[in-house]
């Protein structure tokens, strides 16, 4: 009897630990009349605004986080994917999959200021604060879209929004991350089943790291302090941890399926993985080579993109409209 009581108390303790660690759902933000798949997000820290790509709706949704309401819809886009709000210029960049354009909007009036035309499939966007450059991944082979073989690239826009140069990769680049203290950029190239490493300044490819443990590498996050790169794979669904000094895979752990966004929370040594299978995973970094899944939060199916805002300790996840399931943004507090 004492054994069973002890076991029950231990089980209860584990359940409580999972409920009180990781993430806490704070609120739902409704997005009425938004149909189809959702894609990536960006944030205006000072203005407390969230921007969400509604790919299937061909719109960008503007959300006031103080009121918890959508305040504007930007129509007429062409499957918007990546977004970036540049606080230094008060401009919003929106990358479009269908026509390859990146459209630049005034962050106050949302007037279209400029359009940068890439060859095809403008996707993820990143920012390099040192050079004040906006980087757009685009083009190339992409098996999921049935597109032909060809090179992809990272297009680098200067502070005025003009294309200044490109870094060519072997196929379509999915998620990519830049070092803040170094000069390397890491890019997932799933149609080649590898991570390609480039010198951001010289524009040359330095290395190609095969993702042999798992394939179809899409989201990525970087722990620069510990020289660790986190890769979200879909076939099978696993998180790969790569040593950025050697290119060696040092850890592999099971994660939610159909992931399209993952984030590293440096303050809590934690990784959040958003998957369309219908869960958000929280994994604790025990040390640079060891990771434990501490929580597995249920979400509406198809919720696979989001944004972690370290300044606020918040994670946002984008829910698509499917049947009776309405489009919305889930807001979580990291604990």
Please identify what each model-predicted range represents.
Residues 2-13:
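Bacterial N-terminal signal peptides
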Residues 17-335:
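Predominantly soluble domains enriched in secretory-pathway, periplasmic, or organellar proteins
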């Amino acid at each position: 009897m004492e054994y069973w009581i002890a076991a029950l108390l231990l089980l209860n303790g584990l359940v409580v630990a999972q409920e009180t660690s990781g993430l806490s759902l704070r609120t739902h933000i409704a997005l009425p009349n938004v149909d189809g798949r959702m894609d990536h997000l960006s944030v205006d820290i000072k203005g407390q605004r969230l921007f969400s790509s509604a790919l299937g709706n061909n719109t960008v949704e503007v959300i006031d986080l103080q009121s918890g309401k959508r305040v504007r819809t930007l129509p007429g886009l062409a499957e918007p994917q990546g977004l970036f709000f540049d606080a230094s210029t008060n401009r919003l960049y929106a990358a479009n999959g269908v026509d390859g354009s990146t459209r630049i909007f005034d962050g106050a009036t949302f007037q279209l200021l400029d359009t940068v035309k890439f060859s095809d499939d403008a996707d993820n966007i990143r920012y390099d604060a040192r050079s004040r450059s906006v980087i757009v991944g685009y083009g190339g082979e992409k098996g999921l879209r049935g597109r032909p073989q060809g090179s992809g690239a990272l297009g680098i826009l200067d502070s005025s929004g003009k294309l200044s140069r490109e870094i060519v990769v072997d196929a379509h680049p999915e998620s990519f991350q830049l070092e803040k203290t170094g000069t390397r950029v890491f890019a997932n190239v799933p149609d080649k089943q590898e991570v390609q490493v480039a010198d951001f300044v010289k524009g040359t490819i330095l290395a190609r790291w095969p993702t042999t443990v798992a394939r179809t590498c899409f989201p990525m996050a970087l722990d620069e302090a510990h020289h660790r790169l986190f890769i979200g794979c879909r076939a099978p669904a696993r998180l790969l941890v790569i040593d950025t000094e050697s290119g060696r895979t040092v850890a592999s752990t099971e994660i939610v399926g159909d992931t399209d966004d993952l984030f590293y929370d440096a303050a809590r040594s934690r990784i959040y993985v958003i998957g369309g299978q219908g869960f958000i995973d929280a994994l604790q970094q025990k040390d640079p080579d060891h990771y434990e899944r501490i929580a597995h939060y249920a979400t509406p199916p198809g919720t696979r993109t989001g944004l972690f805002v370290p300044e606020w300790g918040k994670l946002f996840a984008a829910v698509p409209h499917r049947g009776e399931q309405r489009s919305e943004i889930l807001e979580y507090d990291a604990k």
